[in-house]
Regions:
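Short alpha-helix in the alpha/beta-hydrolase fold that links the catalytic acid
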Residues: 4, 155, 169-178
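Active-site nucleophile loop of the alpha/beta-hydrolase fold
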Residues: 82-92
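Catalytic nucleophile-loop/oxyanion-hole region of alpha/beta-hydrolase
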Residues: 26-52, 57
Length: 218
């Protein structure tokens, strides 16, 4: 999300770009982190930004999109949200039970799913492994409790979806758009994969997010 944050800062907006607990260091730091840790950090970043400005737009990619949805549900005064390939629907119960079984057997990680990028000249800086317990927490502590609340939120959303996403099923964006209680503006990306903010459409995403922010904060 650094590119999005820099685009907003370059356009004159105040910006907060929190580094979530367990992210950007080592897999060993991620293993004990949970939804409560990430949401706490996001809430703190929101509070810092809201103390400086009158209107706030929240944006996130993937799990950051989940936290963007969570922030909208927690803060009804948010002017708008930008969700890019968000994890908004829980994985199949069978998969979660399988992961729990692996955890019970002592398996803490499985091969990573990072760098889902179409542009061969770009590689995402991501962990080589995906910790399992944080994944379960994201689904059970984060996404599942939000499902019944999507319809009550009236905050405008810009929903950006990669048609060829190998991490988050693009069909879940259709579900989110149908569930959301506020106006939803949709953009479908033909050229980019999951990490669209670093892919072929990154500049288009930045331009679209800036235009949306200008509209909802006018």
């Amino acid at each position: 999300m650094r590119g999005v944050a820099e685009a907003f800062a370059g356009a004159g907006y105040d910006v907060e770009l929190p580094r979530l607990p367990g992210h950007g260091t080592a897999v060993s730091d991620m293993i004990p982190s949970r939804w409560s840790d990430w949401s706490f950090e996001v809430a703190a970043a929101y509070a810092r930004l809201a103390a400086r400005v009158d209107k706030v737009v929240v944006a996130g990619l993937s799990m950051g999109g989940s936290l963007t949805l969570w922030t909208a549900l927690q803060q009804p005064s948010v002017s708008g949200i930008v969700c890019i390939n968000p994890a908004s629907q829980p994985q199949a119960e069978e998969m979660i039970e399988m992961v729990k079984g692996m955890l019970a057997e002592g398996t803490e990680v499985f091969p990573g799913i990072g760098s889902d990028i179409a542009d061969p000249n770009v590689k995402e800086s991501s962990y080589p492994e995906t910790p399992l317990a944080p994944l379960v927490s994201m689904v059970e502590d984060g996404i599942k409790p939000m499902l019944s609340k999507y319809g009550s939120c009236k905050i405008p959303m810009l929903l950006i979806t990669s048609k060829n996403d190998h991490v988050v099923d693009p069909a879940t964006s259709d579900e989110l758009a149908a569930q959301w209680g506020g106006p939803v503006e949709r953009i479908l990306l033909d050229r980019s994969f999951h990490v669209a903010t670093q892919d072929y459409d990154k500049d288009f995403i930045n331009e679209s997010a800036l235009a949306f922010a200008a509209k909802v904060t006018a």
